[in-house]
Amino acid sequence: MSGFNFEVITLFPKAFELINNLGVITKALDKNLIDVNLHDLREYGEGSYRQVDDKPYGGGAGMVLKPEPIFKAYESIRKLPKSKTLLMSPQGKVLKQEDFLRWSSLDQLIIICGQYEGFDERVRCLADEEVSMGDYVLSGGEIPAVSIINGLTRILPGTLGDPDSLIDESHNSYLLEYPHYTRPRVFKDMKVPDVLINGNHKEIELWRKEQMLNRTFQRRKDLIESQFSVQKHSDYDSNEWFWDI
């Protein structure tokens, strides 16, 4: 085992074949920067039919994942010293970029993917955190789990060819990223801004910061409001925060 360790408990391991076709993750796997192990819940199912779900007590629609297979799969995983267990759930805290930064200091993430109508409530005791992708419901936790593997992997040292590419990305500074342009200079009467052509790096930097602030204000004002709410309770100058982005 080498690099950052992901252990994923899932009923549909084939959903993770996607990671072998994602450039960033593939490179990290090839460099042994990460290790991804899948635990098929069906292998821990009960009886000759490998049952993993059952009808809910009290009635209701759908099927619920049984606790026994999930606990067996979880207990089969060798825990590393710095490890956290995530439960993918629409009831969880919405995933943010800062979560990737926080988890990157760990050695291991164990990710439990829900399915159907969810999982037996007793499974929650295994989790350190419950994580949601947003205020919507997917058919299972596999796609969110792939997103977590992708988002965390790309910030690990050695993954990206140019580490500086992370600096100005959307959400890394609580602002959305500035617009990007490449050749041709004019396309369908749409021109690249002159400031990006003139070679004045100070003007380019100022333009990019203005674009980040304007774009965030127009599209995600909540990010600015939350950041200034934090700064309001500290000695940090809000103008200094803007120039430090």
Swiss-Prot record:
Reactions the enzyme catalyzes: guanosine(37) in tRNA + S-adenosyl-L-methionine = N(1)-methylguanosine(37) in tRNA + S-adenosyl-L-homocysteine + H(+)
Cellular location(s): Cytoplasm
EC number: 2.1.1.228
Pfam families, sorted: tRNA_m1G_MT
Stored InterPro entries: Alpha/beta_knot_MTases, tRNA_m1G_MeTrfase_C_sf, tRNA_m1G_MeTrfase_TrmD, tRNA_m1G_MTases_N, tRNA_MeTrfase_TRMD/TRM10
GO cellular component, one term: cytosol
GO BP annotations, alphabetical order: tRNA N1-guanine methylation
Entry annotated with the keyword tRNA processing: yes
GO molecular function: tRNA (guanine(37)-N1)-methyltransferase activity
Record: residues binding S-adenosyl-L-methionine: G114, M133, G134, D135, Y136, V137, L138
SUPFAM superfamilies assigned to the protein according to its UniProt record, in alphabetical order: alpha/beta knot
Keyword entries, A-Z: Cytoplasm, Methyltransferase, S-adenosyl-L-methionine, Transferase, tRNA processing
CDD domains: TrmD-like
Principal subcellular localization: cytoplasm
Protein purpose: Specifically methylates guanosine-37 in various tRNAs.
UniProt record similarity statement: Belongs to the RNA methyltransferase TrmD family.
HAMAP family xref list: TrmD
Self-association state and partner proteins as the record states: Homodimer.
Protein name (database record): tRNA (guanine-N(1)-)-methyltransferase
Gene that encodes the chain: trmD
